């Protein structure tokens, strides 16, 4: 594409659908679930009034959405070179020149600044955790680890697990064991989720020279890593034992179900894409069900 063609593309307005791609709205929405659960659990466990906490919850959700969307937009800016190589990324506005670099950076930093302002309005810990999430995702994951080490997914899991901490401190102002437990659940969940996706796109990552674990170490090694993270999930519901035996039992069954699904096709080497797809779909359902369970059980306790 020549310069004139590029200008003609970037001077048009970006559609709402394209904006969603730029800020990775699906990823943002997924992270808002544990953020809300963290806030809700803080209300229940620290005896805050729900009605008086609604403004904090809303401001936390707005701030979290903005900082995550802004960080994702900056990630898209930095990843333009590799996204142009990967077939699954060809519809991104950053790849087909639907948005200029200048506008993309303005959008990214504008969202992050406003988002951080919202979080700091809540309290200092919320703003600081937001900054940790931004720096961790943009610097340590996007710029450094993603292109240099097979540990990139684990590195990215740390900032990716910050939302429930922000949710909690937005209400209570300080962390607790329950907040850390939610953080650990998201932290351990992410490698399983993203390794499953990486198995499905292993050839693409290899083509773009991104050292994802399946592309570098192969399917067997990746699958073993996924099982390790699944095992690490098993004791985490017990850290939330204050929610009661029912919660611990259901959450443990949810973990065991995922482990059982993983073992069903463990030996079928030729079926690796189907296996990865099943694990990926379960991971999506797991995130929603686990945190919905946190909210529902704590609501029952509050009533």
From Swiss-Prot:
Q: What pathway annotation does it carry? A: Porphyrin-containing compound metabolism; heme O biosynthesis; heme O from protoheme: step 1/1
For this protein, the record's InterPro entries field holds: Protohaem_IX_farnesylTrfase, UbiA_prenyltransferase, UbiA_sf
Q: Which UniProt keywords apply?
A: Cell membrane, Heme biosynthesis, Membrane, Transferase, Transmembrane, Transmembrane helix
Q: Is this entry keyworded Transmembrane helix?
A: yes
* Molecular functions per Gene Ontology: protoheme IX farnesyltransferase activity
Q: How does it sit in the membrane?
A: Multi-pass membrane protein
Q: Where in the cell is it found?
A: Cell membrane
Q: Which reaction does it catalyse?
A: heme b + (2E,6E)-farnesyl diphosphate + H2O = Fe(II)-heme o + diphosphate
- Report quaternary structure and partners: Interacts with CtaA.
Additional information = Carbon 2 of the heme B porphyrin ring is defined according to the Fischer nomenclature.
Query: Could you tell me what this protein is called?
Result: Protoheme IX farnesyltransferase
Where does this protein come from, organism-wise? Staphylococcus epidermidis (strain ATCC 35984 / DSM 28319 / BCRC 17069 / CCUG 31568 / BM 3577 / RP62A)
Q: In the UniProt record, what gene is named as encoding this protein?
A: ctaB
């Amino acid at each position: 594409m020549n310069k004139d063609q590029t200008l003609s593309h970037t001077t048009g307005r970006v559609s709402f659908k394209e904006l969603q791609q730029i800020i990775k709205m699906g990823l943002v929405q997924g992270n808002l679930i544990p953020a809300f659960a963290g806030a809700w659990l803080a209300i229940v466990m620290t005896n805050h009034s729900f009605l008086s906490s609604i403004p904090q919850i809303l401001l936390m959700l707005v701030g979290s959405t903005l900082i995550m969307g802004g960080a994702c937009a900056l990630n898209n800016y930095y990843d333009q070179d590799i996204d142009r190589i990967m077939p699954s990324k060809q519809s991104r506005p950053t790849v087909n020149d639907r948005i200029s670099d200048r506008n993309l950076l303005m959008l990214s930093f504008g969202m992050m600044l406003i988002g951080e302002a919202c979080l700091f309005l809540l309290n200092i810990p919320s703003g600081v955790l937001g900054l940790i999430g931004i720096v961790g995702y943009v610097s340590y994951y996007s710029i450094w680890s993603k292109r240099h080490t097979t540990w990139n997914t684990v590195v990215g899991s740390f900032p990716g697990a910050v939302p429930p901490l922000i949710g909690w401190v937005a209400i209570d102002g300080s962390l607790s064991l329950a907040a850390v437990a939610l953080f650990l659940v998201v932290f351990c969940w992410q490698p399983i989720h993203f390794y499953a996706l990486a198995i499905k796109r292993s050839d693409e990552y290899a083509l773009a020279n991104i050292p994802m674990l399946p592309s570098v170490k192969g399917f067997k090694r990746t699958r073993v890593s996924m099982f390790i993270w699944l095992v690490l999930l098993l004791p985490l519901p017990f850290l939330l034992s204050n929610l009661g035996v029912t919660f611990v039992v259901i959450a443990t069954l949810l973990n065991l179900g995922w482990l059982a699904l993983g073992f069903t096709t463990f030996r079928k080497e030729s079926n690796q894409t189907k296996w990865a797809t099943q694990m990926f779909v379960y991971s999506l359902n797991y995130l929603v069900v686990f945190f919905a369970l946190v909210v529902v059980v704590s609501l029952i306790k509050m009533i």
